[in-house]
Amino acid sequence: MEYNYHKNAGQLAFIKFVKGLVHLLIRPKVEWKDESLKKSLKGKPVVFVCNHTHHFDGVVISSVLSRYKPYMLVKKSWYDKSGTGSFIRICRSIPVDFDTMDTNWYAQSEGAVKNGYSMLIFPEGGIAREGKMLPFKPGAALLAAKKGLDIIPIASLGEYKILFGKRQKILIGNPIKSEC
């Protein structure tokens, strides 16, 4: 399946608008383990992996990482919904079908990386409830190892609060080298 990685001006404007809303309403507090990574990652495709605690995670983490142009993997059932699916498709996303052995997500992810984009993957494959992480699916490690990409771990801590209350904390760790 051929995939168009070049977004039009309307889509880019929408992504910037969403980023502005996220920073205005949710006010994520981002902490880098190594501040120098902010510059060294620019223009370099990597695989960002993050825990998944809420439906907002994809939008919030993508907004925080927008300068690194991440494509996020999205469960196909969400991608296909009429309301949220349209929103998800406008943002940089690639559908993953958990119900079949479909590997289109991998081919599309390879294409995104080849075109200079990073990947944002929630390796749990779903939202973890009760503060306990789910077992990881192998996709993030597979893509990183096969393409020789660094893995950048991210921890999303706390609950989302709109406007008031404690800010969502996003911790971005040091790169993990991958080899195949």
Language model features: what each stretch is:
Residues K7, Q11-I15, P28-C180:
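Soluble catalytic domains of membrane acyltransferases
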Residues M1-Y5:
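Short, Lys/Arg-rich, polar N-terminal cytosolic tail immediately upstream
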